[in-house]
């Protein structure tokens, strides 16, 4: 019996689409009502989560879709997972939900156990965790940690603040509010808050009308595919982009205190960074005393066939901070140097300091991934799925450009000639029973849960071939 069958013996055997259009009439009706109190314009359909199960999401019209988007890559184990339901019904969860603690001042007696459970899933080389509330919050907290660390190295870790620092910071001025930058990359997505938004550079709609920090955006490598046929050209691309990074660090108008990168830019188009590129960034950050942050918000927790995508690069020495959220349901960053803990309390602080209810779920997710060997399964299924997609690429090369993600689990994407054609394909896929997402201008990205198996891949490939023929 497969892992999916163990979890979901009553999972549907295939998608069922009952309506002629999506969203269907009942979804449209209820979305109109919901629209009175919530912005429903981005909605695909109105979901019925009580009826959704495993790898299938159901809407209020009774349509059941094979879900390869999984709540924008945030559902790790499928819908209504029994292990997570068990964790949700625990006394610890009830306490966390009913009497949510202000952890900084009033930590619960079980917090040590909860955090140590999360740390079982920490990336190699990381043994501390700082909790947050969302992916954007995780990155904002990481930036704060980086700035505090950077200034502590200049001033002395145990040194007190000067009177000038205490006075100037109240006017948002230096030296108390130092002029420092975070370097990110073009096409990056790190969140929609103010600092994270300043490092985001994927679509104008994410940033318009918001004041932003004047921080540098370097070039992220754009590889030619297949990778094994373009190794020389791609190495030149890596070196070109690395030279830009180093030049920006040396010449930017204010000091670059930190660098943040996604090992695969997800929202920006599923752009991959090579092992060589990620390691060379480590060399550069060490050379210029820059904090190295890996954003694993979307790539983390198993979808690439490893628990953390950057582990493919085996970066040495380990990066300074690794941010997480999405599939872990909780959020925060991992680190290993205790000096990233501020020298005084209340510097990295808020009322909640994370959410114990979500931390409990994160610990349960990590345990299930480990016990069921779900990263190994994801790697196996991803290889199977990629070979099937290569077959479609040979048959329809125009509609499967730059197929990428080989050897990266089910974290797979490809491009269509235009955004309009991509959007039409996604629409056809829904009508043929598959919920799939796009990214960037004309890319299709696959983000199924870790319980997605070969039988699901076969269903998807059949629906995809049919949808492409209908374009």
Swiss-Prot record:
Compartment annotation: Cytoplasm
UniProt binding sites for pyridoxal 5'-phosphate: 135-136, 351
Catalytic reaction list: 4-aminobutanoate + 2-oxoglutarate = succinate semialdehyde + L-glutamate
Listed PROSITE patterns: AA_TRANSFER_CLASS_3
Presence of keyword Zinc-finger: no
GO cellular component: cytosol; mitochondrion
GO molecular function, one term: pyridoxal phosphate binding
Record keywords, A-Z: Aminotransferase, Cytoplasm, Pyridoxal phosphate, Transferase
Main location: cytoplasm
EC number annotated for this UniProt entry: 2.6.1.19
Origin: domain of life: Eukaryota
PTM sites of type N6-(pyridoxal phosphate)lysine: 326
Induction: Subject to nitrogen catabolite repression. Expression is low in the presence of the preferred nitrogen sources, and up-regulated by GABA.
Gene Ontology biological process terms from the UniProt entry: gamma-aminobutyric acid catabolic process
Cofactor dependency: pyridoxal 5'-phosphate
Pfam assignment, any one: Aminotran_3
Residues at which substrate binds: 192
Activity's dependence on pH: Optimum pH is 8.3.
Remarks, miscellaneous: Present with 573 molecules/cell in log phase SD medium.
Function: Required for the degradation of gamma-aminobutyric acid (GABA), which is important for utilization of GABA as nitrogen source and for oxidative stress tolerance. Deaminates GABA to succinate semialdehyde, which in turn is converted to succinate by the succinate-semialdehyde dehydrogenase UGA2. Cannot transaminate beta-alanine (BAL).
Protein family: Belongs to the class-III pyridoxal-phosphate-dependent aminotransferase family.
Subunit structure, as described in the record: Homodimer and homotetramer.
Protein name: 4-aminobutyrate aminotransferase
Gene from which the chain derives: UGA1
């Amino acid at each position: 019996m497969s892992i999916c069958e163990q979890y979901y013996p009553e999972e549907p055997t295939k998608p069922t689409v009952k309506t002629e259009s999506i969203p269907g009439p009942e979804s449209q009706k209820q979305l109109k009502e919901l629209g009175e109190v919530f912005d429903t314009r981005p909605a695909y359909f109105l979901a019925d989560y009580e009826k959704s199960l495993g790898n299938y999401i159901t809407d209020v019209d009774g349509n059941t879709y094979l879900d390869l988007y999984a709540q924008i890559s945030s559902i790790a184990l499928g819908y209504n997972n029994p292990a997570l339901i068990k964790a949700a019904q625990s006394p610890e969860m009830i306490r966390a939900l009913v009497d949510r603690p202000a952890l900084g001042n009033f930590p619960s007696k079980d917090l040590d156990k909860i955090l140590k459970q999360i740390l079982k899933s920490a990336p190699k080389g990381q043994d501390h965790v700082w909790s947050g509330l969302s992916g954007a919050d995780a990155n904002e907290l990481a930036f704060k940690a980086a700035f505090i660390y950077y200034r502590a190295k200049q001033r002395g870790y145990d040194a007190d603040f000067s009177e000038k620092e205490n006075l100037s910071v109240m006017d948002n001025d230096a030296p108390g509010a130092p002029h420092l930058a975070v370097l990110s990359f073009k096409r990056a997505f790190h969140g929609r808050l103010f600092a994270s938004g300043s490092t985001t550079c994927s679509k104008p709609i994410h940033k318009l009308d918001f004041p932003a920090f004047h921080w540098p955006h370097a070039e992220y490598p754009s590889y030619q595919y297949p990778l094994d046929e373009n190794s020389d050209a791609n190495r030149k691309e890596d070196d070109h982009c690395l030279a830009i990074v180093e030049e920006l660090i040396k010449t930017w108008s204010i000091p670059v205190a930190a660098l943040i990168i996604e090992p695969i830019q997800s929202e920006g188009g599923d752009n991959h960074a090579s092992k060589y590129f990620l390691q060379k960034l480590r060399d550069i950050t060490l050379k210029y005393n820059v904090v190295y942050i890996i954003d694993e918000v979307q790539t983390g927790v198993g979808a690439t066939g490893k628990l953390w995508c950057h582990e493919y690069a085996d970066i040495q020495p380990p990066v300074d901070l690794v941010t997480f959220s999405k599939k872990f349901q909780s959020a925060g960053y991992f680190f290993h140097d205790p000096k990233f803990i501020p020298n005084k309390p209340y510097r990295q602080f808020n009322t909640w300091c994370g959410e114990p209810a979500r931390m409990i779920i994160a610990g349960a997710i990590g345990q299930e991934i480990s016990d069921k060997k779900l990263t190994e399964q994801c790697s196996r299924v991803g290889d199977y799925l990629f070979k099937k997609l290569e077959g479609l690429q040979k048959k329809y090369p125009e509609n499967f450009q730059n197929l990428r993600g080989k050897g990266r689990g089910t974290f797979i994407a490809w491009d269509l000639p235009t955004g309009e054609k991509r959007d039409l394909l996604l629409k056809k896929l829904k009508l043929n029973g598959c919920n799939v997402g796009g990214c960037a201008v004309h890319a299709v990205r696959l983000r199924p849960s870790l319980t997605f198996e070969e039988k699901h891949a076969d269903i998807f490939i059949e629906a995809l071939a049919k949808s492409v023929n209908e374009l």
